[in-house]
Amino acid sequence: MLDLKRIRNNSNEIKEALNNRGEKFDVTVIDEVLKLDEERRNILVKVEVLKSKRNQVSSEVPKLKKEGKDVSNIVAEMKNLSEEIKGFDATLAKIDEKIQYIMLRIPNIPNPQVPDGETDEDNIEIRNWLEPTKFDFEPKAHWDIGTNLNILDFQRAGKVTGSRFTFYKGLGARLERAVISYFLDTHTEKHGYIEILPPYMVNRTSMIGTGQLPKFEEDAFKISEDDYFLIPTAEVPVTNLYRDEVLKGDELPLKHVAYSACFRSEAGSAGRDTRGLVRQHQFNKVELVKFTKPEQSYDELEKLTNDAETVLKELGIPYRVVRICKGDLGFTAALKYDLEVWMPSYNRYVEISSCSNFEDFQARRANIRYKEDSKAKPQYVHTLNGSGVAIGRTVAAILENYQNEDGSVTIPEVLRPYMGGKEAIK
């Protein structure tokens, strides 16, 4: 959520920034929220005048009573003032509700570093690692490799649940588990993150806090009778871990890593990478989340991105890093990098991680602040997160980039200790 004071003082700048985003945004709501804000502030002035008058009148009552004078007119005046204040308070509550409704639907403002552009074709490659994998045979898609090795079963998952689910079987299940353990061990032991195992369901307030609601409710799986939501990413519960709290400045940056299953309806994604493991309704992911001071956040974003890159380098999977343009930035991020791995069957790079700085956008929604010391005024933290990285897509990338002509798949060296020393899946 944006700072209302920032909108008030820089409305034209805010409108221009919102106009530059890819998704068409009705900037007239900025004028609407400013009108409501002005109305609210005018009423607050009136309320303060009335309260001052009520206090003044009230202070006269004891003296007049002591003198034996009739105070019924004064008491009646106090009652009228209180009723008038009560009416204004009710009006303020309605105005606050309208302002909140609008503010929750205004996207974040892109950082000046974000390049211009309208679609993912306008994203800018920052760096890459390893050349795309070459084969002297026709490479297979990961869903065919997994099916042929009897380690992935999409057909039976379709029978049991529906499309875009899978069973991992045998060494496929072990490979998934190995990747999860390797990622968690790397981020906790080498990169200094504190591990969290979060709930897989959250309440509506949590989804609002990280920006999934109200805009993206159709993409979420909802437990209607309880108003709970299955988490689309561990970012939601981990960020909300500190909702409505004031952290200590010397604790920052706080770094958490969390493995979780993730659940997404992927509404509107029909036909886009819907075969195999790339775009499933349920998938596993290791998430990196940071809480920082504002002046630290962009340095910490670079570190977080490098942490996510490390596991791809050690796995030996070709990848690149792209800076996301304004039109592809999404609702909550101020600046975002995507890590994309090479997928031979697609003959292109596929996103495996998004690393974002939200600045104070989520912190304002979730009311997460910090104080430098006990006497300091609380300030909003900056929140960051990134996949460290998506598990199913990592398995897909391993199957495709490490496939052999005989149909087997070589296991990356860093995963072999987690696979009982096995060197290949045959």
Curated annotation (Swiss-Prot):
This is Serine--tRNA ligase. Gene3D superfamilies: Bira Bifunctional Protein, Domain 2, Serine-tRNA synthetase, tRNA binding domain. ATP binds at R264, S265, E266, E351, I352, S353, S354. GO terms for cellular component: cytoplasm. L-serine binds at T233, A234, E235, E287, S387. One of its GO terms (molecular function) is ATP binding. NCBIfam families: serS. PANTHER family: SERINE--TRNA LIGASE, SERYL-TRNA SYNTHETASE. Its EC number is 6.1.1.11. The keyword Protein biosynthesis applies. Catalyzes the attachment of serine to tRNA(Ser). Is also able to aminoacylate tRNA(Sec) with serine, to form the misacylated tRNA L-seryl-tRNA(Sec), which will be further converted into selenocysteinyl-tRNA(Sec). Consists of two distinct domains, a catalytic core and a N-terminal extension that is involved in tRNA binding. It is found in: Cytoplasm. It comes from the Bacteria. InterPro entries: aa-tRNA-synt_IIb (IPR002314), aa-tRNA-synth_II (IPR006195), aa-tRNA-synth_II/BPL/LPL (IPR045864), Ser-tRNA-ligase_type_1 (IPR002317), Ser-tRNA-synth_1_N (IPR015866), SerRS_1_N_sf (IPR042103), SerRS_core (IPR033729), tRNA-bd_arm (IPR010978). Belongs to the class-II aminoacyl-tRNA synthetase family. Type-1 seryl-tRNA synthetase subfamily. It catalyses: tRNA(Ser) + L-serine + ATP = L-seryl-tRNA(Ser) + AMP + diphosphate + H(+); tRNA(Sec) + L-serine + ATP = L-seryl-tRNA(Sec) + AMP + diphosphate + H(+). GO terms for biological process: selenocysteine biosynthetic process; seryl-tRNA aminoacylation. Pfam families: Seryl_tRNA_N, tRNA-synt_2b. Pathway: Aminoacyl-tRNA biosynthesis; selenocysteinyl-tRNA(Sec) biosynthesis; L-seryl-tRNA(Sec) from L-serine and tRNA(Sec): step 1/1. The keyword Glycoprotein does not apply. Keywords: Aminoacyl-tRNA synthetase, ATP-binding, Cytoplasm, Ligase, Nucleotide-binding, Protein biosynthesis.
